[in-house]
Amino acid sequence: MRRRIVTAAGLGLAFLLTSCGLLSPSDEAGPGPRHGRASSLPSARPVPVGQGSRAAGDFNGDGHPDLVLDSLLAPAGGHDDDPGIGIVYGSAHGLDPATRELLTPARNAAPTGETVPAAFDAETSCDLDRDGFTDLVVTTDPPYDGVGRPPVPVQLLFGSPRGLGPARAVTLRIPDRARIGNEWPDQPVCGDFDGDGAADLAVTTSGPRISYLRGPFTRGGAPRAAGAPVAVPGTALATTTPLSPPPDIDHDGADDLLVRSADPGRRARSRLALGGPQGPTRAGTAYPPGYAVAFGRFAAAGRGPAPLTAVTADTDGLLSVAGRPGTIRTGTGGAPTLAAADVTADGRTDLALGGTRPALLLGSPDGLSPTPHRLALPRLPGTGRPLATVIALTDFDGDHHADLVLLTRRGPTHDRVTVYPGGPSGLAARPTRSFTTADFAAAGLSAS
């Protein structure tokens, strides 16, 4: 069973959110309050009480998307255990670092007997029980003696009018008939893969097969139905970028599942398993090798709307668009991360790329522009080039322009989360929100 330290799409994405604050973009990320530096967090406020909504990633149901951060920097003197998962709640004016929560294994994970998990990783999110509050899917490390079939490490945290903080996770119930072999169930991915309007889960099992769990789910973690494992064209699953919907390439009303030949974070070929009434059972389009795939309307529009296509990012941000290898060279450096959304509100999909030189590519009537618009990174102590990971690209403030959230890290002790608002000409030149995750963990308790 893999354990992610920094994730991009994936949720997943997920980063250890320990501090969210409003800072000048030029402020440096120091070693944390424990070294005498003022916290980058504002004083915490209670999470707003919501009534339920249809917004993606809305854990408290107030109609505004929220942000999940995993892979937090541990405070000085901390132990090796996972410091937790951070949530920054949204508002009518965008992400509000004052309304935040720290989810920890001790407070929020389901124990196995008397054993509390040490690992607590955010994987994906969707409204599993159809109550209007987004739920968070996490993976843990339950005890296992190596004999027989391992326990299920996937847990569900259900959203509520007060968010995720009050929740105690439940273990996902995967019927024996839906498992095969003795591999850990892993890499959960949300999507409506049968087109019935309820969120389903796909989870890896042994070999090129998945456990396909049909929603909605009970508060006890049980799916509505689950049959025998489903064969898919790969051995690993790739989630979409957090707050991005799963693709429906063939427009049949059922989401499609992206399958890889190697775990996320490794260079691999990928292919779609097309959804339908029986779930993601049909092999679909194959994509060139790379590290990440994003979906959008990237091709030239012609006389009608541009078709939904894929972009695959390879080393140094070399992009293959609509299956054409090496179409665009972006020079973003390293193994890139991706997110696609409409930043300029012109009806075309734009593409954000993470790396050592992150950039935005704008959509146009002729397709995705090959000209990268570089993003200014925060100053961080240390040596070497900082690496920026795309956390999310979505409209957080309701102005119809997608906003970008980056996590920039230099070494194991310094990072900065930055928010770049979208606008008619692209992303803002400088971030309007900036904080280090080390403060989030150091702050400990939330104000919920």
Please give the residue ranges for each predicted region.
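Beta-propeller-forming repeat regions
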Residues: 2-448
